[in-house]
Amino acid sequence: MANFYKDNSELKFQFSHPLMEKIVTLKEDNFKDFGKYDYAPANVEDAIDSYDKVMEIIGEICGDVLAPNAEQVDHDGPVCENGRITYAAGTQQNHDALTQAGVYGLSLPREYGGLNFSMVPYVMAAELVSRADAGFANIWGLQDCAETLHEFASKEIKEEFLPRINKGDTCSMDLTEPDAGSDLQAVMLKATWDEEKQMWLLNGVKRFITNGDAEIKLVLARSEEGTTDGRGLSYFVYDKAWGGVTVRRIENKLGIKGSPTAELVFKNAPAKLVGDRKLGLIKYVMSLMNGARLGVGAQSVGVSEAAYREALKYAHERFQYKKAIVNFPAVYEMLAVMKAKLQASRALLYETTRFVDVYKAYNAIADERKLTPEERQDNKKYSKYADMFTPMLKMMASEYANQNAYDAIQVHGGSGFMKEYPVERIYRDARILTIYEGTSQLQTVAAIRYVTNGSYLAKIKEYEAMEVKPEFAALKEKLVAMTAQFETACEAVQDKGEEYIDFHARRLVEMAAHIIMSYLLIIDAQSCDAFARSAEVYTNKAQAWNNERASYIASFSLENLAAFAAIKDEFVAEEN
């Protein structure tokens, strides 16, 4: 029997992080549920033990059910008939197994049937599911919608929907439209208040909706007549049982084929308002998207793990010139870099998740009582860290997942191009990761302000101030030099206009990420030898990557920008 949690000691290691004691204590609000609910922990150790046991259950289901089903699900896919979607048989089996195990609603309060887990084990579960089947991870991960309802909906709506989600009712977040993709301010699906029926009615079309035929939908719609911007949008919850929504078609996709992506038609579909009018995009969707981006970070790490394991396994099994190909420097370098990127992504994932955990726990406590001045200050700090690290995580982890999937095929050679091996599916599944929930380019837009205002640099200096063991001193010296190089690169783009900064934004964000991820690997390696080799490999690679970026920025001028900008005036010639 395979267990995707027990076969990877790096996961359980995350529960030993020093910040976990604070996270668990805040999440459990000093363990007030103990004695009130079955299985509510009495202390930090009790809570961590529960996390560990549930991860074992999920790991076993991933290894024994989800992963064996993945190839057939990819082949079969969902079917759309008569305006409804039917999952592939394996997808339904996956969903049933996780529902019966009671692992939906991991992070929701116990009063609604959840387990009240912190975000760290929830994200870990998402990583496990993604390693098994990245497509199914979308269906399972859309329980994130419950977090939004819990945070912003009325008590009545919470009581109506949250217990159902915890029991396995599926969700979707219906945001994008044919003319509103990344630019959600352009959403035009109309929400109209019906005085006679005393309800909201939704009319219009949604496109590229993951798990589009879900039982429970969160829908972004235009409630304010005559508006054209984000301030006219509100957020609604819809129950499939109420009728009024049909599936026009499902998309024929490159990858994640088990996850149905649908175009939907709303015709007088009844819905309930979530929170306040006009805050749909500027508050509620932004919160949901941050959670979704964290989820894609976990999905990316899971895909990276799957790609690396397949490549390593094949490299040991495949013999050429009378020896396993893992013995050739060209191959073992590739594998070492794959592992370093994987472990660096995982380090950034859980660092980001810990920041999210702390500020979310404080926000939950603030709903019950007034925070002390010290708590408010702490909350502000971790909220800023979460905002800084989330776009960096989403960009870096998804890009590395694509690179690792690409290299996994390369290790397999011609065999990797064939469907007999899972790496071609992993490669196809990985491609969406840099696109949905905000492209890598949009993550750069979100992250660059933390470069220009010095926030990343300040955090790097915090890591720099930490003591390291003698064996890591040389690596730290390299990072100190790389930090000075990063400062110089930042100064080089100042006072040259917004377009110039935007042009170099990705290079600058990546430079910061390489330094941060190197430090995180060194920090992990201080207490776990499993990270030591990757800390060395990644830091040395990061130095080379940053040298290239710094050199390009230093030799670039405003005049050089014109050669790139000229492409705006080119068009593809078409025959009449």
Protein language model annotation of sequence segments:
Residues 1-81, 85, 571-576:
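Extended, charge-enriched "interface" segments that sit outside catalytic cores
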Residues 39, 241, 248, 260-292, ...:
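A glycine-rich, basic-preceded beta-loop-alpha segment at the flavin cofactor/substrate interface
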Residues 2-6, 10, 17-19, 102, ...:
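Alpha-helix capping/hinge segments and adjacent helical runs
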Residues 112, 454, 466-576:
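C-terminal amphipathic alpha-helical interaction region
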Residues 17-61, 148-154, 331-349, 355-377, ...:
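N-terminal leader/propeptide and maturation segments of large enzyme subunits in energy/redox metabolism
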Residues 199, 203-245:
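A short core secondary-structure module
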Residues 59-60, 90-167, 210-212, 436, ...:
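Internal helix-loop-helix
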Residues 343-394, 490-503, 522, 526:
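C-terminal helix-coil-helix/basic helical segment that borders enzyme active sites and/or dimer interfaces
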